[in-house]
Amino acid sequence: MKRPVLIGITGGTGSGKSTVAKEIYNKFDEACIAMIEQDSYYKDQSSIPFEERCKKNYDHPDAFDNELLIDHLKNLVDLNVIEKPIYDFEAHNRKEETIKVEPRDIIIVEGILVLQDPRVRELLDIKIYVDTDADVRIIRRLLRDINERGRTVDSVINQYLTVVRPMHMQFIEPSKRYADIIIPEGGHNRVAVDMMVANIKHLLQK
């Protein structure tokens, strides 16, 4: 097995980056592709009371255990199996169990700050930024956090105004300059997704 092709997909919250990642993932046989979600690598917070966990800024680079993420990506590049963490968004903490991820021809790394850390960037063969209007992103975030993460409307809006938007402007938006490809309109841009799939297939044939 050759060195895997690592693809980084980033963008603001609700930009459609997960949709783009899934669209690309679904174009390949499951035996040759794996998904690494940056959200799985939030730091372990077992020693912090739940009330304090609720107040933390989860859109700041310090919220992520990039040391573990980088170690896992390097292991996959070296064709080693990893144990990917599972994060519980309602408990704001990692679960005890993990998911075994085996090396594959293609590794997708998806998350809001994938391009922010230069150590992660240098491991990536293709860097994608999904660019979507802010009003679309906040509506998607609102629906997701209420329906999937047990949040209230007020808490989501307050978090967006005080944390999510400032962090987007400070860390996520500036990382766009590191992207090889910028995809507008998120996962609905079928032409861009098809072009990416063709590019990945070309890299695999080298």
Curated annotation (Swiss-Prot):
Single annotated GO MF: cytidine kinase activity
EC number annotated for this UniProt entry: 2.7.1.48
Annotated ATP binding sites: 11-18
Reactions accelerated catalytically: uridine + ATP = UMP + ADP + H(+); cytidine + ATP = CMP + ADP + H(+)
Enzyme class: transferase
Record keywords: ATP-binding, Cytoplasm, Kinase, Nucleotide-binding, Transferase
Protein's cellular compartments: Cytoplasm
Record bears the keyword ATP-binding: yes
Similarity field: Belongs to the uridine kinase family.
Name of protein: Uridine kinase
